[in-house]
């Protein structure tokens, strides 16, 4: 097929010459342009078939690229650059740690966002003596690149640049509960080698379902000796605490120049301008916030955010991201325990004047604002934070304890895992449990990671609700092993967002929409099988609303099946009335609900799938049905997938391995889609 297309394109100039009297110059130009586009498409389609498929997410506005990171490295005397593909900030944090490590080996490193540079410049990297490029690449969702690595991934797919002489290493961040574990890290590692680059250390694969921090430390402690051996250098000293930012206190600053929680542009919340994205969120008013379940054990809620006049567009299956705020009680306690005035206006300025990152968070601001809106104070701190903090513990035993947990020894790793990670000790808890640990608040703010946006599957259809985005969420609250009660940052914050607001003022939520590949079939007549227990029902509320809307427009709509699961019908049956109405009206062909705690034996969604196996097989094999699974990745999604393997094997009929291939092909064709989390 490829050859026939090449032959056709080769004859185009001759054909055009013969017909010149029949076509105008404009016709010829347009015709040639079309043929050129088709030829380009077929060439690159063939290339893309040889590598894993990632779905491209369109960004609203392409960022401005710097001219050359190699020239910048030359100018600033760097020989190591660490690029990061980061969605939640962890890969960026690891990249910063690696670039900071370089000084111990007589080298100079810099971390960089691939979105800010032209990666075609990689071929010029060998011009720098003993140069090395490292990639810390996270995989997002079902095998996708992170938003900031999308352009880099596209370039890797299409380029044929010769990277001979380029030395590289890759550390991937993934989660084994997902189907495509560390797909991005694996692809970057493989593709760089294909292009001629030389791998100087093995690919690292971090697993967030296990202990990502330990995976990184283990890889890192073997990575640097390999770098030393390859380049013939020696470590110049032990790891030491080096401040990256300097504190500047502003005595008489105009408050109009002070950040109060904005993510990007100063005063962007007062003067909102589209397009809205992660760096420019929209302040949406909460119009509805109602509890969905009975009882007091858990709080499941439905929120509606007003996006009128925002020009935000979304489709069923997209995600809404919200920027939460930390609990003011925790913020005040940190201020009290450190004896700090939280309302001091300050800036943390990068000591490296050549760095693109001038501040760790928007500055100037106050400590209160930083701890409330910009810094993560509720997740267990990583080992590098403990190492830096240890110097401020005046009690030797506490300092030793912190140093041990920050070490790479087996005992230290076990201690960190049990005392920090498994006990879910956040920074306030550590300060409370170590009475002599009293770091300067500015250094603490430098060390803490950024507070990240939280993503939720949109629970509405824009066809029905074009001016609002709906969220379905459960308020997270649990008792940690330390005996403390921990609460989820975003869900606890959202829970307080009442439509009336305080003193009659509107409750506002900074938000933006992230496009997804979790999409209804193009043809409304295609049957859909939706599996979503608990809050996994959220995107299906949008799907069902849209299918109902299509029916109202007089369109023929295929079978719409929902497999939903909850504990008890009188406790946590979400959207019970709405689902019953859709079922009664015929928009929902089947409403199948599994109650796990309503009878002696537990019933889950996979049990109902097995019950309906013959009909499901007919819909899949003969009707071309699309399958959608949303919810827990660790257990539910795997159990459901195994159930479909069994159904396919039984009615195929075929061997188990063939059934697995059958389902995997459904995934490749976009007929088996996942929106899962762990």
UniProtKB/Swiss-Prot annotation:
It is found in: Endoplasmic reticulum membrane. The gene is Por. NADP(+) binds at residues 298, 535, 596-597, 602-606, 639. FAD binds at residues 424, 454-457, 472-474, 478, 488-491, 677. It comes from Mus musculus (Mouse). Residues 80-224 form the Flavodoxin-like domain. The modification N-acetylglycine is found at residue 2. One of its GO terms (molecular function) is hydrolase activity. Belongs to the NADPH--cytochrome P450 reductase family. In the N-terminal section; belongs to the flavodoxin family. This is NADPH--cytochrome P450 reductase. Its cofactor is FAD; FMN.
């Amino acid at each position: 097929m490829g050859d026939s297309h090449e032959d056709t394109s080769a004859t185009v100039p001759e054909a055009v010459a013969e017909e010149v009297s029949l076509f105008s110059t404009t016709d010829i130009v347009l015709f040639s342009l079309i043929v050129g586009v088709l030829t380009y498409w077929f060439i690159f389609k063939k290339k893309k078939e040889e590598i894993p498929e990632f779905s491209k997410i369109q960004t609203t506005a392409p960022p401005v690229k710097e001219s050359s990171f190699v020239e910048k490295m030359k100018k600033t005397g760097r020989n190591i650059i660490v690029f990061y593909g980061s969605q939640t900030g962890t890969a960026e944090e690891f990249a910063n740690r690696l670039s900071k490590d370089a000084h111990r080996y007589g080298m100079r490193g810099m971390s960089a966002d691939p979105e800010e540079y032209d990666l075609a410049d990689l071929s010029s990297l060998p011009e720098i003596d003993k140069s090395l490029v490292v990639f810390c690449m996270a995989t997002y969702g079902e095998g996708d690149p992170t938003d900031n690595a999308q352009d880099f991934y596209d370039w890797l797919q299409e380029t044929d640049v010769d990277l001979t002489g380029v030395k590289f290493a890759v550390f991937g961040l993934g989660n084994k509960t997902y189907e495509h574990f560390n797909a991005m890290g694996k692809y970057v590692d493989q593709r760089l080698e294909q292009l001629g680059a030389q791998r100087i250390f093995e690919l690292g694969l971090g697993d967030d379902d296990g202990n990502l921090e330990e995976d990184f430390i283990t890889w890192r402690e073997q990575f640097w000796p390999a770098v030393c051996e390859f380049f013939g250098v020696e470590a110049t000293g032990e790891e030491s605490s080096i401040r990256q930012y300097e504190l500047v206190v502003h005595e008489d600053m105009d408050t109009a120049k002070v950040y109060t929680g904005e993510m990007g542009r100063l005063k962007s919340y007062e003067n909102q301008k589209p397009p809205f994205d992660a760096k420019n969120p929209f302040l949406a008013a909460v119009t509805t916030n109602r509890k969905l379940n009975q009882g007091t054990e858990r709080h499941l809620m439905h929120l509606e955010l007003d996006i009128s006049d925002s020009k935000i567009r979304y489709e069923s299956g997209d995600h809404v991201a919200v920027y939460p705020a930390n609990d003011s009680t925790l913020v005040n306690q940190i201020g009290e325990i450190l004896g700090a005035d939280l309302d001091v206006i300050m800036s943390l300025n990068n000591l490296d004047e050549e760095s693109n990152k001038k501040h760790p968070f928007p500055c100037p601001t106050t400590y209160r604002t930083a701890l409330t809106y910009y810094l993560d104070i509720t997740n267990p701190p990583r080992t590098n934070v403990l190492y830096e903090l240890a110097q401020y513990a005046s009690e030797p035993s506490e300092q030793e304890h912190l140093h041990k947990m920050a070490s790479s020894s087996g005992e230290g790793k076990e201690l960190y895992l049990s005392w920090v990670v498994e006990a879910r000790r956040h920074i306030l808890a550590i300060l409370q449990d170590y009475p002599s640990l009293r770091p300067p608040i500015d250094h603490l703010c430098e060390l803490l990671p950024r507070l990240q946006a939280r993503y939720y599957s949109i629970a509405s259809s824009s066809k029905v609700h074009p001016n609002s985005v709906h969220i379905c969420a459960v308020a997270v609250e649990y008792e940690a092993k330390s005996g403390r009660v921990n609460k989820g940052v975003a869900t606890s914050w959202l829970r307080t967002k009442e439509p009336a607001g305080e003193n009659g003022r509107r409750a506002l939520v900074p938000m933006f929409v992230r496009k997804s590949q979790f999409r209804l079939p193009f043809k409304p007549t295609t049957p859909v099988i939706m599996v979503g227990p608990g809050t996994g029902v959220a995107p299906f509320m949008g799907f069902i609303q849209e299918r109902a809307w299509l029916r109202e427009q007089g369109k023929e709509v295929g079978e719409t099946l929902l497999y939903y699961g909850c504990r008890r019908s009188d406790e946590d049956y979400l959207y019970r009335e709405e689902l019953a109405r859709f079922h009664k009206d015929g928009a929902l062909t089947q409403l199948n609900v599994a109650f796990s705690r309503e009878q002696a034996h537990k019933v889950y969604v996979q049990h109902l799938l097995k019950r309906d196996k013959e009909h499901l097989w007919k819909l899949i094999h003969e009707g071309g049905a699309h399958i959608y699974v949303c919810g827990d990745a660790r257990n539910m999604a795997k159990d459901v997938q195994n159930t479909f393997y069994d159904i396919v094997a039984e009615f195929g009929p075929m061997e188990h391995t063939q059934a697995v291939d059958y389902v995997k092909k459904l995934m490749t064709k976009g007929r088996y889609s996942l929106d899962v989390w762990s």
